[in-house]
Amino acid sequence: MTSAIAELFDKITTESGLGRSLDHEGSANYAVQKTLIKVATDHFVRFGYRRANIAEIALGAGIGKGTIYLHFENKRELFLSCLIAEERELLPQLEIIENFPEEERLRAFLEVTFNFALTAPLTRALLSRRQDFAALIEEIDATILKNQDEKVTEYVINKLISPVTHNLDTDDKKTIANVVNLATLAIGYLPEMAFDLPGQEIRTDDFVKTLAMIIDQGIKNT
């Protein structure tokens, strides 16, 4: 039986204009696409979207430049596909969380997503160095992004917030889901030096666990 979070990932990753998932692992194209995603992710993290060069990505992947376009329509689709591949690394953890007792899911979800925002290289680069990715952001249809956000918000409300809150209406729950999303984005902006400032040093995993605990308890007490 497919988990709700896996269904959500499938809906998001099949949305036109938001990249594509890799072909099936047993397919002839899988190995080439996997290598391309790995090399391209490194280039996008190092150089940003505009300065990343398709020819150099192809060279790093050991293929001709034209071969890239057999798998990805353009640089934008390649970049968004790199994001999808990075986000899919979250899926096994989130599927495990779905099987947790209802009262434990929200906090576990927060810990996983906050940690992802701090450690996923491409997502972190996109959040913390938006000037390097401005050209890409301008190219993406805002309606597509809105639809994606609505799907994620619906999941967070139905699977994580509603089971542990009993005095909130739909608008309140949506507001909380939006706050959680904004908190995740804000964490992605944090520079690494923020955790080493004199007098307030904190390990990132302690930061993630403490923040998740505070938000979890705050929501449950609302």
Q: Predicted regions span which residues?
A:
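Short, flexible, glycine-rich and Lys/Arg-enriched loop motifs at helix boundaries
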Residues: 19-20, 24, 124-146
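Amphipathic alpha-helical interface segments
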Residues: 39, 43, 112, 116, ...
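Amphipathic alpha-helical packing segments from all-alpha helical-bundle domains
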Residues: 91, 137-167, 174-178
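Hydrophobic/aromatic-rich alpha-helical bundle segments in the mid-to-C-terminal region
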Residues: 4-5, 123-128, 146, 164-211, ...
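Basic, helix-initiating cap at the start of DNA-binding domains
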Residues: 1-47, 51-63, 77-80
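Short hydrophobic/aromatic patch on the recognition helix
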Residues: 61-72
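Alpha-helical structural segments
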Residues: 30-42, 46, 60, 77-100, ...
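Helical hydrophobic small-molecule/effector-binding pocket
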Residues: 104-133, 147, 151-154, 177, ...
